């Protein structure tokens, strides 16, 4: 067995194509990893929580694979690779903000340009403010790709309003 993947399933396969975990499979394919590997993935959040857990996994997986190959990687590179993997390898209809935020970590002001480039400026909040930040899981589940698809389909309908905002 060349690849062992432990998540809600236990996989022991010989080729990347046999891997069922979509994120692991996509990252291994993207970075052309052909040596055997074992991945253990345990998450506290259920899938489709809307809290960026998929992008967190993709960024973390890519980072781990780069480290295993002794390849230095920047936060910017991790973000761009995660976007590429999720949008063009996994073919998910997702945005870019989750991947950027996960790659950079912390609290940030992110400006995303129309051409896909971005700037990420870390924010150092007052400690009192930090003590009062709360992340809330609502228990609702949704597919980010469905939401993104709906937003894109509504773009033409709402383009006048969007242009005024931008």
Segments from the language model and where they lie:
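C-terminal nucleotide
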Residues: 1-33, 42, 65, 69, ...
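Short, conserved micro-motifs enriched in small and acidic residues
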Residues: 18, 51-56, 76, 163
């Amino acid at each position: 067995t060349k690849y062992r993947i432990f998540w809600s399933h236990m996989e022991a396969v010989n080729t990347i194509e046999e891997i069922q975990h979509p994120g692991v499979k996509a990252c291994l394919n993207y970075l052309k990893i052909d040596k055997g590997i074992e991945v253990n993935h345990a998450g506290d959040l259920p899938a489709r929580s809307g809290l960026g857990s998929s992008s967190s996994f993709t960024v973390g997986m890519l980072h781990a694979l780069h480290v295993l190959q002794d390849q230095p990687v920047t936060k910017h590179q991790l973000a761009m690779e995660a976007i590429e993997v999720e949008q063009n390898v996994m073919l998910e209809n997702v945005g870019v903000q989750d991947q950027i935020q996960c790659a950079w970590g912390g609290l940030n002001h992110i400006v995303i340009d129309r051409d896909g480039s971005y700037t990420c400026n870390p924010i150092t909040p007052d400690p009192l403010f930090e003590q009062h930040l709360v992340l809330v899981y609502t228990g609702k589940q949704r597919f980010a790709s469905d939401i993104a698809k709906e937003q894109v389909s509504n773009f033409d309908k709402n383009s006048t309003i969007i242009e005024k905002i931008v």
